Every structure is written in structure tokens, then in C-alpha cells.
Amino acid sequence: MSLQELCRKNLPDCELPEFFDDYVLQLLGLHWQDHGSLQRTGKNQVLVQQEPIHINEALKSAASEGNYEIVELLLSWEADPRYAVVGALESNYYDLVHKYYDQVKDCHDMLPLIQNPEMFEKCHELNNTCSLKCLFKHAVIHDMLPILQKYSDYLDGWQYCNQILFELACKRQKYNMVVWIEGVLGVGNFKILFTIAINNRDLQLYSLGYLIILERLYSCGQDPTFLLNHFLRDVSMKGLLPFVLKTIEFGGSKEIAITLAKKYQHKHILKYFETEEC
């Protein structure tokens, strides 16, 4: 092991000697150009010119500068290689991207680290076997609405894909996506929202479904009673009191709920209504 390797391995966990100027640190590979001294202080943290920073953020920054030496050093200190690829991608250092992408293997593993829609799409393109439908699904999962908005003309009329995205948004509790997909793209089977909400015990989604569909029915002059009581029967038979109450709040029949509670012996529902009447 060389002196440089020995120092890089052992010095980072100790306080750097005061006589270590930039020249010495450069010789030891512990100087980050335009930043200063670099020192490891724990598994997930480094000091950059004595300022603490998460090792992965340091790696992302070094990669965005195309600084191979610092990237290699931080990776040897067990930084997450995903941040190297994301940082390099931000500044179009594709030679560095391809060098470390093999350590990541799946672009989808990096998507949660990205907040910028353009970068998100750029990262997804690293896997050239993925389709646009795959991009759209991950846009839903990671709340990247601007991507769906960008491709809204492309998605317009693609009912099969829009239905998949809508159901995915419901299952993943991406409520803003649910509203946008239904309102802008449209879906063939909106009622699946209620099935998903009931199966997942997602009262917020269940309520959102009524807000959307009742507005549509009222605007067309249609009576929502049949729809309300249809789902009221379902949640009443299952004994889901919060869903029963929410349906009644929107106009469902309390009598139906009580009748089914008696039939299926849901004592907690009966007790609620008995207490309410007292």
C-alpha cells in the first residue's frame, strides 16, 4: 500500500494536522479543488473545509463537477453510487455516468433521488429498453406531474394507458395525480377508484371519488342516489363504519346502513347509530 493510500485510509477519521497545507493535502488526495480539505468523519458524513456534509451530497456535487478523483475517493468511503450517476447526469458528464451506471444497474433505483422533471426523464432514458408507458408509471409513483403534462397530447385518447395510470395513482395514494388524470385525460372506469379505496381502507381516496363524481353528476342533472347506495351497501356489509358515515354524509341512506348492520351483525355500527339517537 502506497503512502498516499495509507493516509487516505487512516487520516480521514482523525483530525488533520495543522501543518497540512493545500499542497500536502493534494499530494495525499485529500484536497477537493475549489472546496478545500476533505475528511471523513463517520459512515455517512464528511467534512469539506471543516464544514459537515452528507457523503452522498458530496458525491453528487463532485460528480456534477466531473471530478473523478474525488468521486473515486468518496465511493471508497462507501458513498452511494447512485448519487455519482445523478450528479454526473446533471452536468452531462456521460463518460462518468456510464462508468458508474453499472454499479447501479437499474435507472429506476435513482428516480427517487431526483426532483427535477427534466432530469427525471433524462435518468429514465439510461435504460433504453424502457417504454414511455414505463416513464409515465414512474412519473405517477414519484409525483412527477409535469412529465404527464408534457406528454398530455400523446396520452390523449390512449385510454388503456390512462386507465393503468389512474389505477396506479389510486393505489399509491397520489391524489393530485388522480384528479389530474381523471380531469384532463379521462378514464373509462372511474368506479374502480371506490373499489381500490375500500380494499385499501383509504377513506381519503373514497371521499375524493365522491367529490369528483358527484360534481360531474350534478352538472349533468343526474341523481347520484343509486351510486351512493350501491357503495353504501358494500361498505355496510363489510362493517366499515368510517366509510358508511362518509357515504351518508354525501347523501347515502342511513336506513340501508342500519338494515345491513343488523343483517350482518355489525354491532359497532348499530351502537354508533343508537348512541347518536340518544
Curated annotation (Swiss-Prot):
Keywords: Early protein
Induction comment from the UniProt entry of this chain: Expressed in the early phase of the viral replicative cycle.
Keyword Zinc appears in the UniProt entry: no
Listed InterPro entries: MGF_505
Record has Acetylation as a keyword: no
Function: Plays a role in virus cell tropism, and may be required for efficient virus replication in macrophages.
Family: Belongs to the asfivirus MGF 505 family.
Protein name: Protein MGF 505-3R
